[in-house]
Regions:
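Active-site residues of response regulator receiver
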Residues: 56, 86
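A Lys-centered signature of the CheY-like receiver
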Residues: 10, 108
């Protein structure tokens, strides 16, 4: 099954790195959608179906907090899995998102293997990549 992925981060470099990690991790990606903030992400969701959303928290304009709150209140989007990819790790910041229905979070910087394991747990499949492609780098 090919997955449509929405990556939301104000850094174009980070969005490109996440795309690369998903590719080398063996996920069957149908289409990538990208937004630099929550407002762009909502515009994408209005016109496209996505299977998972990977979002930063700290972005200009509509941040990740407002984005997650909007998604989880919207009847068409509330069941789309959301994974935060953020520099935050403090429970007082992360726990409210988990209580809202966010599936998980990945702390930046991250290892490609971390994304592969967490998304495999959510999406249920990934091809095991060549270890030499993922073990030697952090993003």
């Amino acid at each position: 099954m090919a997955y449509n992925v929405l990556i939301v981060d104000d850094s174009a470099t980070m969005r490109a790195l996440i795309r690369k990690v998903l590719t080398i991790s063996g996920f069957d990606i149908g289409e990538y959608f990208e937004g630099a903030n929550g407002q762009e992400a909502l515009g994408i969701l209005e016109h496209n179906w996505v299977d998972i959303i990977l979002s930063d928290l700290h972005m200009p304009g509509m941040d990740g907090t407002a984005l997650v709150q909007t998604i989880k209140k919207h009847e068409m989007w509330r069941n789309i899995p959301v994974v935060l990819i953020t520099t935050e790790s403090r429970p007082e910041v992360i726990d409210p998102f988990l209580n809202l229905g966010v599936q998980d979070y990945i702390q930046k910087p991250f290892r490609p293997e971390t994304i592969r394991k967490k998304l495999t747990g959510i999406l249920g499949e990934a091809i095991t990549p060549d270890a030499s492609e993922t073990e030697s780098c952090d993003f």
